[in-house]
């Protein structure tokens, strides 16, 4: 899977861009604030219809503009397709080969991407929202039904919270029953992904670290009896919701569910957040991204496009080398941003292209 052409119109500070990326390594360099991350954001949006910065539609449109357009030509198995996302303040529209997609499931999967940003390096030591965000992105790529399951859960959660905010008990049981059923679908899909990724994680971590440390990744239910959940998931969630009923009325929001769950990262049987060194934590996240890439490659029988946003400043020389060696072995396309070419050993990257970005313009 390769992005052969990219065209942008009025996307943030990238006004009129036409780009023909190389099939392997593409390095974009320039000072901060010139548009490097915006370029990666446009590719991510072309694949997922979302901004990885969690930006509103209006923020994606250039100042004074009415809309933004992101269009790309994607090649897979020698077949090319043109995909496009039109961004307006009131919403987005997706097209494949000029045909408007009424079902987004028909749009997703034409371009698969894996994102690696400085934010994700802090995933181990950061808050649970960072880990949930990573997990949701990762699950969705190979399980398109997950998006529907999560949106259904989010709608039910919103309605239940609306009742809790006004301390309305009438009707809460109906929404609680729906919440539990929707939550189980989300949790099931999240756990299934972690089971698959966990088998790959150890091998990549050992390759990076060069030692026999053991790593674990587990799903942690917030406020739910894990043993009871293993026996009777629905009853475990219902029991937890009953136990937190007073807290929910006081806070005006739902205290139990996938929106509160977390991931546990373990190293040698202890929590990586508390006991792993900074270097070990970075190795863990790097191994996690490698496992994600491998999982997507197996899922689609084609590697995803990798987006590396200023990672050379976050990884030390050894980990950078390990990552690049991993990428060299795979027929995957990579987009790298950096403030200086000195941060990337370009001469060691085969089939590389470099682009300078200045004030929203790309200079070859």
From Swiss-Prot:
Q: What is its main location?
A: cytoplasm
User: Does the record bear Transcription regulation in its keywords?
Assistant: no
Which Pfam family is one of this chain's hits? SMC_N
Q: Which GO terms describe its cellular component?
A: cytoplasm
Q: Which UniProt keywords apply?
A: ATP-binding, Cytoplasm, DNA damage, DNA repair, DNA replication, DNA-binding, Nucleotide-binding, SOS response
Classification from the root reads: Bacteria, Pseudomonadati, Thermodesulfobacteriota, Desulfuromonadia, Geobacterales
Where does it live in the cell? Cytoplasm
Q: What is this protein called?
A: DNA replication and repair protein RecF
Under the heading SUPFAM superfamilies, the entry gives: P-loop containing nucleoside triphosphate hydrolases
Matching entries from InterPro entries are given as: DNA-binding_RecF, P-loop_NTPase, RecF/RecN/SMC_N, RecF_2
Mind telling me which Gene3D superfamilies this protein's record contains?
A: P-loop containing nucleotide triphosphate hydrolases (3.40.50.300), RecF/RecN/SMC, N-terminal domain (1.20.1050.90)
Any one GO MF annotation of this record: single-stranded DNA binding
Q: To which protein family does this belong?
A: Belongs to the RecF family.
Question: What task does this protein carry out?
Answer: The RecF protein is involved in DNA metabolism; it is required for DNA replication and normal SOS inducibility. RecF binds preferentially to single-stranded, linear DNA. It also seems to bind ATP.
Decide whether keyword Cell inner membrane is in the record: no
Annotated GO biological processes are:
DNA replication; DNA synthesis involved in DNA repair; double-strand break repair; SOS response
What are the binding positions for ATP in this chain?
A: 30-37
Which species expresses this protein natively? Answer: Geobacter sp. (strain M21)
């Amino acid at each position: 899977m390769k992005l052969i052409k990219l065209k942008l119109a009025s996307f943030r500070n990238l006004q009129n861009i036409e780009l023909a990326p190389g099939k392997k390594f593409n390095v974009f360099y320039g000072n901060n604030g010139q548009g490097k991350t915006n370029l990666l954001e446009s590719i991510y949006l072309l694949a997922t219809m979302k901004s990885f910065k969690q930006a509103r539609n209006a923020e994606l449109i250039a100042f004074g503009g009415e809309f933004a357009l992101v269009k790309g030509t994607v090649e897979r198995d020698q077949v090319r397709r043109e995909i496009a996302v039109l961004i307006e303040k009131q919403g987005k529209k997706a097209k494949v080969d000029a045909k408007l997609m009424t079902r987004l499931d028909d749009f997703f999967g034409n371009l698969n991407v894996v994102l690696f940003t400085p934010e994700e390096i802090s995933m181990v030591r950061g808050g649970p929202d960072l880990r949930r965000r990573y997990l949701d992105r990762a699950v969705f790529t190979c399980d398109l039904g997950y998006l529907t399951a999560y949106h259904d859960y989010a709608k039910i959660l919103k309605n239940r919270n609306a009742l809790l905010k006004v301390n309305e008990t009438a009707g809460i049981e109906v929404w609680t029953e729906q919440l539990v059923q929707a939550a189980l679908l989300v949790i099931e899909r999240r756990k299934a992904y972690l089971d698959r990724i966990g088998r790959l994680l150890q091998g990549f971590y050992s390759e990076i670290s060069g030692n026999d440390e053991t790593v674990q990744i587990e799903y942690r239910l917030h406020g739910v009896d894990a043993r009871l959940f293993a026996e009777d998931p629905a009853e475990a969630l219902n029991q937890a919701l009953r136990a937190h009923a007073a807290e929910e009325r006081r806070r005006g929001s739902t205290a139990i569910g996938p929106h509160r769950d977390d991931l546990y990262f373990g190293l040698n049987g202890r929590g990586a957040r508390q006991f792993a060194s900074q270097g070990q934590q970075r190795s863990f996240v790097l191994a996690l991204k490698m496992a994600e890439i491998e999982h997507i490659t197996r899922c689609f029988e084609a590697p995803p496009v990798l987006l590396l946003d200023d990672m050379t400043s976050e990884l030390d020389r050894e980990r950078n080398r390990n990552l690049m060696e991993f990428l060299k072995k795979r027929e995957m396309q990579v987009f790298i941003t950096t403030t200086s070419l000195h941060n990337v050993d370009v001469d060691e990257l085969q089939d590389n292209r470099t682009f300078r970005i200045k004030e929203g313009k790309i200079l070859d």
